[in-house]
Amino acid sequence: KKVLIDLKQISKKKFFKGLKFSNLPILMGVLNLTPNSFSDGGKYIKKNLGIQHAKKLIKDGCDILDIGGEATNPGSKQIKEDVEWKRIIPTLSKIKKLRKFVSLDTRKSLIMKKGLKFKINLINDVSGFEYDTETIKVLKKTNIPFVIHHMKGNPRTMQKNPKYNNVVLDIYDYFEKKIKYVRSKGIKHNNIILDPGIGFGKNLKHNMN
């Protein structure tokens, strides 16, 4: 019953600090500072190209800039923290000067801690806190909004014949467990976004459902 109440409160959330919800969609512009992301891998890793693209995303109407330095598309391999941060820092340091709502896409607690020093507004962990158990401690300490993302398996395995009893109900059950988990770790706020993870451990039929 408590989890159901939490889910209703999260779904009715009207705003986060620096971001208001209304009847209009909120657009997130994705900036992949990687050589191997599926949509724009390698396009923005060179000097100044990342910030130039960020400005274009803002001009095109994006409310959130989601910046990441590690590809998590199907078949991608994990990278070391120092490599990920080296990709992110040149652009992140400039993006915050644009005074926009910035989301940091990372699975690693160390990258989160470093990003928080640049006053990021949101943490987007596609692993649902399963990759690095220290991430939940970072979230509790900072009280920052975050995304609970659903992914079946990991980036290397998630598209290898994913199966569900009922994809909608299974994902709902997953979010129930995750909310129970974050509550058990002492996170009381409802600054939470639930992402069903379209394309992450799901075939076309799963995605359409």
Predicted features along the sequence, with ranges:
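N-terminal amphipathic alpha-helix/helix-capping segment at the start of soluble metabolic enzymes
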Residues: 1-35, 180, 187-188
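Conserved beta-strand positions in the central sheet of alpha/beta enzyme cores
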Residues: 2-5, 63-66, 103, 124-125, ...
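Glycine-rich anion/phosphate-binding loops
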Residues: 3, 8-11, 39-56, 82-86, ...
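Short beta-strand/loop segments at the ligand-binding rim of alpha/beta enzyme cores
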Residues: 24-27, 96-105, 121-122, 189
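Conserved anion-binding
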Residues: 27, 33-39, 71-75, 112, ...
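Conserved, mostly hydrophobic/aromatic
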Residues: 31, 57, 61, 105, ...
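Glycine-rich, proline-tolerant flexible connector loops at the mouths of alpha/beta enzymes
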Residues: 38-39, 63-91, 198-204
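Alpha-helix-loop-beta-strand connector modules within alpha/beta enzyme cores
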Residues: 77-104, 110-114, 141-151
